Swiss-Prot record:
<keyword id="KW-0732">Signal</keyword>
<comment type="function">
    <text>Putative antimicrobial peptide. Partially neutralizes lipopolysaccharides (LPS). Exhibits anti-inflammatory properties: inhibits LPS-induced iNOS/NOS2 transcription, nitric oxide (NO) and pro-inflammatory cytokine production in mouse macrophages and human peripheral blood mononuclear cells (PBMCs); inhibits LPS-induced activation of MAPK and NF-kappa-B signaling pathways in mouse macrophages.</text>
</comment>
<dbReference type="InterPro" id="IPR020400">
    <property type="entry name" value="Cecropin_insect"/>
</dbReference>
<dbReference type="InterPro" id="IPR000875">
    <property type="entry name" value="Cecropin"/>
</dbReference>
<keyword id="KW-0399">Innate immunity</keyword>
<dbReference type="GO" id="GO:0045087">
    <property type="term" value="P:innate immune response"/>
</dbReference>
<feature type="signal peptide">
    <location>
        <begin position="1"/>
        <end position="24"/>
    </location>
</feature>
<protein>
    <recommendedName>
        <fullName>Cecropin-B1</fullName>
    </recommendedName>
</protein>
<dbReference type="GO" id="GO:0019731">
    <property type="term" value="P:antibacterial humoral response"/>
</dbReference>
<dbReference type="GO" id="GO:0050829">
    <property type="term" value="P:defense response to Gram-negative bacterium"/>
</dbReference>
<keyword id="KW-0964">Secreted</keyword>
<dbReference type="Pfam" id="PF00272">
    <property type="entry name" value="Cecropin"/>
</dbReference>
<dbReference type="GO" id="GO:0050830">
    <property type="term" value="P:defense response to Gram-positive bacterium"/>
</dbReference>
<keyword id="KW-0044">Antibiotic</keyword>
<keyword id="KW-0391">Immunity</keyword>
<keyword id="KW-0929">Antimicrobial</keyword>
<dbReference type="GO" id="GO:0005615">
    <property type="term" value="C:extracellular space"/>
</dbReference>
Length: 60
């Protein structure tokens, strides 16, 4: 397939998704899941970072 055809197809799908009058139920659920993952990663890094820096200080 030609690149321009693939690009046109992707552009068309993107326009349909962005301008469609569908409810945001599915996208909202996905966004909430991603937000939850981000919060969990942030909290885990807050807990682990002092441990790692303390471990590095002991190793010096």
């Amino acid at each position: 397939m030609n690149f321009s055809k693939v690009f046109a197809l992707v552009l068309l799908i993107g326009l349909v998704l962005l301008t469609g009058h569908t409810e945001a139920g599915g996208l909202k659920k996905l966004g909430k899941k991603l937000e939850g993952v981000g919060k969990r990663v942030f909290k885990a890094s807050e807990k682990a970072l002092p441990v790692v820096t303390g471990y590095k200080a002991i190793g010096k």
